[in-house]
C-alpha cells in the first residue's frame, strides 16, 4: 500500500481531519496527504476524503461556503473522472452542496444537535466503499450533527432506491428501519448514498470514530479497507494490460 496516496481535505473549521488521518494510517501504514482548502493541486492522490467538522463555521448553511473553495474545483473534476471521493458528515454536506450527490441535508427533525452511537445497516455492499461488508450487516457507528436529516424529492428518493445508491440506512439492532432508529428524520432512514457511478459516497455517521475496538466499535474500519482494496486493485490493473475506474455495481 506504500504507493497509494489518499488526500484529506482541510477546511477552516474541520475537526475530524486528524481522526480520519489516524484511521487511514493505523491499518494501511499510509500517511494521508493533508490538502488545505485554498490549494489547486490534489498532489497525485488516488482518493479524496472530505472529513467532518464545521467548515467555515457552518455559516449560511452547512457546506455551502466550502463548495466554493479552490480545492473543491479540483475535487469535482477528480470525481468527474470516476475517481473515489468519500464525504463524512460535514463532508457529505459539502458533496451535496457541490452537486456531486443528490438531495439535501437539513436540520434534524428534533431541531437539536445529536451526538450518540447509531446503528446502521449495509444496504449495498457492492460498492468500492462497502465490499468488505455483508449485505444487511448491522454496524455501530457514532454520529454528531445538527443537519443530518436527508431530504430529496420523491422522484430522487425512488431513483436512489432503485439504482442501489442507498448504501447505509438507520436501523435498529436487528436491521429494521424503524421510526425510533431514524433519530434525525431522514427520508427512508437514509444514512449514506453514492452517486450513480458509485465513485462518490457521502454518509453522516463517522466511520473514522469506529475504526478500532478501543473506541467502542471497529465497524467503520472496513469502509477504509474496502476503499484501499479497490485502490490497490486499480494500481495493479494499471501496471498490467489496462486501467480500471469505479463503476456502479448493483447490490448483491
From Swiss-Prot:
GO cellular component terms listed in the entry, alphabetical order: cytoplasm
A Pfam family per the record: GATase_5
Positions of the catalytic residues: 89, 206, 208
Documented EC number(s): 6.3.5.3, 3.5.1.2
SMART domains in alphabetical order: GATase_5
Chief site of localization: cytoplasm
Listed GO MF terms: ATP binding; glutaminase activity; phosphoribosylformylglycinamidine synthase activity
Domain of life of the native organism: Bacteria
Residues in Glutamine amidotransferase type-1 domain copies: 6-237
Keywords assigned by UniProt, alphabetized: ATP-binding, Cytoplasm, Glutamine amidotransferase, Hydrolase, Ligase, Nucleotide-binding, Purine biosynthesis
Signal peptide extent: none
SUPFAM superfamilies: Class I glutamine amidotransferase-like (SSF52317)
CDD domains cross-referenced by the UniProt entry: GATase1_FGAR_AT
Biological process, per Gene Ontology: 'de novo' IMP biosynthetic process
InterPro entries: Class_I_gatase-like, PRibForGlyAmidine_synth_PurQ
Record field: catalytic activity: N(2)-formyl-N(1)-(5-phospho-beta-D-ribosyl)glycinamide + L-glutamine + ATP + H2O = 2-formamido-N(1)-(5-O-phospho-beta-D-ribosyl)acetamidine + L-glutamate + ADP + phosphate + H(+); L-glutamine + H2O = L-glutamate + NH4(+)
Keyword presence, Cytoplasm: yes
Cited function: Part of the phosphoribosylformylglycinamidine synthase complex involved in the purines biosynthetic pathway. Catalyzes the ATP-dependent conversion of formylglycinamide ribonucleotide (FGAR) and glutamine to yield formylglycinamidine ribonucleotide (FGAM) and glutamate. The FGAM synthase complex is composed of three subunits. PurQ produces an ammonia molecule by converting glutamine to glutamate. PurL transfers the ammonia molecule to FGAR to form FGAM in an ATP-dependent manner.
Protein name per the record: Phosphoribosylformylglycinamidine synthase subunit PurQ
Organism: Chlorobaculum parvum (strain DSM 263 / NCIMB 8327) (Chlorobium vibrioforme subsp. thiosulfatophilum)
Amino acid at each position: 500500500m506504500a504507493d497509494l496516496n489518499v488526500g484529506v481535505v482541510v477546511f477552516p473549521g474541520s475537526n475530524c481531519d486528524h481522526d480520519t488521518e489516524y484511521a487511514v494510517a493505523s491499518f494501511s501504514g499510509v500517511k494521508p496527504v493533508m490538502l488545505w482548502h485554498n490549494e489547486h493541486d490534489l498532489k497525485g492522490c488516488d482518493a479524496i476524503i472530505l472529513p467532518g467538522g464545521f467548515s467555515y463555521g457552518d455559516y449560511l448553511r452547512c457546506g455551502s461556503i466550502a463548495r466554493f473553495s479552490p480545492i473543491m474545483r479540483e475535487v469535482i473534476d477528480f470525481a468527474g473522472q470516476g475517481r473515489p471521493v468519500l464525504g463524512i458528515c460535514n463532508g457529505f454536506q459539502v458533496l451535496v452542496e457541490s452537486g456531486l450527490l443528490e438531495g439535501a441535508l437539513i436540520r434534524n427533525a428534533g431541531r437539536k444537535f445529536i451526538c450518540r452511537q447509531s446503528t446502521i445497516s449495509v444496504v449495498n455492499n457492492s460498492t468500492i466503499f462497502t465490499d468488505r461488508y455483508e449485505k444487511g450487516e448491522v454496524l455501530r457507528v457514532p454520529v454528531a450533527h445538527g443537519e443530518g436529516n436527508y431530504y430529496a424529492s420523491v422522484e430522487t428518493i425512488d431513483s436512489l432506491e432503485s439504482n442501489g445508491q442507498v448504501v447505509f440506512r438507520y436501523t435498529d439492532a436487528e436491521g429494521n428501519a424503524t421510526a425510533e432508529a431514524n433519530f434525525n428524520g431522514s427520508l427512508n432512514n437514509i444514512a449514506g448514498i453514492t452517486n450513480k457511478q458509485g465513485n462518490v459516497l457521502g454518509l453522516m455517521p463517522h466511520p473514522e470514530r469506529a475504526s478500532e475496538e478501543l473506541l467502542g466499535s471497529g465497524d467503520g474500519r472496513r469502509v477504509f479497507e474496502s476503499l484501499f482494496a479497490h485502490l490497490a486493485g486499480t494500481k495493479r490493473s494499471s501496471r498490467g494490460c489496462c486501467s480500471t475506474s469505479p463503476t456502479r455495481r448493483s447490490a448483491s
